[in-house]
Regions:
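Conserved, well-structured ligand/cofactor-binding cores
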Residues: 1-467
């Protein structure tokens, strides 16, 4: 922006606006009123709000309420904003009026300025760009639209990529038998493929959960205007608008079942955030498992070696840390924190309007973006390239006293516990101690205690005891 100014006027009077700014007086007042975080609403939200203005102009024209030439100018201007060509003209802080009115007027003023240039005569931000709308329905609508688009275009594809990488790795290491662990203590064996199948299924469930929210995310409050009654909007505006927006985006938007609910609550945003939190928790679990399996390399589990991406210490030469899993856990923590913010925001629907819309929008879109980006990083820079330390895995498995569990149906729990205790105390393989303490033939013990068979589950013998 230049250091020169022009004078703009609104209902409160005159004030200076940067000469080359596309916004007008109301945006400038918001810039001056909210020098709080320096963080504007994200590009995805501004793009969605521009699509709202574009669809509204088309709907109002079809309803014969808006001059066709004015509508065409607004349509083109809004399309430019939606494409990100004027992002620098949306400076308002996320911590602003709770309805997001400042940002709605920012969009109205910028689009009106651009449309005026296109048309060659004045296009009014309120009378034309905001026709049939209120901030109270446009901002909640933009939350739904921006979230629906970013989930569909960014997060779901990223999670599908992570799922596919996990599936490929699952096949690659599917026959590696390792010590299972419960409570971080040795347990019965599993294959590495079985372990990864659990991770993959977590991600698949995450995708399914996101898809399950879509019907409510696609239901829009646009048409409710100020308090849900639809004052100053054509009775058919909501339906026309939803159809135009569907045509613009390729998503099946529709008017919400109840505009009063759509304006006064943010239950769908809270629901979506909850599903994002579940995905964050899943990624946290996967990342922590990777960190444990990679720990060492000498004094830890050392079952796998993650790709060495960068030096890990400014003081300890040769140290390499699990940086991608660590980044993943931090993203998870942030998303969980954002969910708390969105939950509190959702509680702030007083009578006919929620008044924490901007922070809900910001937090929701940040969570979506972070999860999408870190899912790809985790897939490509950690899971796809890790190597298996077969020797370390086999050594630990051979000395795992919990393998005696497979003998329970044959010798009983008490006898098995005694064998496990002695094997652990003497540091001997369970098969060797079982041979000493039972009358089972060596061949039978080898069959019953074969880790490759134990991972198949089921009963391996019959006799006294069990449970």
């Amino acid at each position: 922006m230049t250091n020169s100014f022009r004078i703009e006027r609104d209902s409160m009077g005159e004030l200076q606006v940067p000469a080359d700014a596309l916004w007008g007086a109301q945006t400038q007042r918001a810039v001056q009123n909210f020098p709080i975080s320096g963080i504007p609403l994200p590009r995805a939200f501004i793009g969605a709000l521009a699509l709202v203005k574009q669809a509204a102009a088309r709907a109002n024209t079809r309803l014969e309420l808006l001059d066709a030439a004015v509508a065409q100018a607004i349509d083109g201007a809004a399309a430019d904003v939606a494409a990100g060509r004027h992002d620098e003209h949306f400076p308002i802080d996320i911590f602003q009026t709770g309805s997001g009115t400042s940002t709605n007027m920012n969009a109205n003023e910028v689009i009106a300025s651009l449309a005026t240039r296109r048309l060659g005569r004045p296009v009014h931000p309120n009378d034309h760009v905001n026709m049939g709308q209120s901030s109270n329905d446009s901002i909640p609508t933009a939350i739904h639209v921006s979230a629906a688009l970013t989930v569909k275009r960014e997060l779901v594809p990223a999670l599908e990529h992570l799922r596919d990488v996990l599936r490929a790795k699952e096949r690659e290491v599917g026959n590696v038998v390792k010590t299972g662990r419960t409570h971080l203590m040795d347990a019965m064996p599993v294959t590495l493929g079985q372990e990864l199948s659990g991770w993959r299924t977590q991600i698949e469930h995450g995708i399914e959960r996101l898809i399950s929210v879509e019907p409510r995310l696609h239901a829009l409050p646009q048409g409710g205007t100020a308090v849900g009654t639809g004052i100053n909007a054509h009775p058919e505006f909501g339906a026309r608008f939803a159809q135009e927006l569907s045509d613009l985006t390729g998503l099946a938007f529709r008017p919400g079942r109840n505009f009063f609910e759509g304006l006064s609550s943010q239950d769908t945003a809270v629901e979506l955030s909850g599903q994002l939190k579940v995905i964050a928790v899943s990624l946290m679990k996967i990342a922590n498992d990777l960190r444990w399996m990679n720990s060492g390399p000498l004094a830890g589990l050392g079952e796998i070696a993650l790709p060495a991406l960068q030096p890990g210490s400014s003081i300890m030469p040769g140290k390499v840390n699990p940086v991608i899993p660590e980044a993943t856990t931090m993203v998870a923590a942030k998303v969980i924190g954002n969910d708390a913010t969105i939950t509190i925001g959702g509680q702030s629907g007083n009578f006919q309007l929620n008044v924490m819309l901007p922070v809900i929008a910001y937090s929701l879109l940040e969570s979506i973006r972070l999860l999408a980006n870190v899912s790809r990083a985790l897939a490509d820079n950690a899971i796809a390239g890790f190597k298996v330390n077969q020797e370390r895995i086999a050594e630990a498995l051979d000395r795992n006293p919990i393998l005696v569990t497979a003998l329970n149906p044959v010798i009983g729990y008490e006898k098995g516990a005694a064998i496990a205790k002695k094997a652990y105390a003497q540091g001997k393989p369970i098969r060797e101690v079982a041979e000493q303490m039972t009358d089972l033939p060596r061949e039978e013990l080898a069959r019953l205690l074969d880790p490759a068979e134990l991972v198949r589950g089921g009963l391996k013998g019959s006799g006294s005891g069990g449970g």
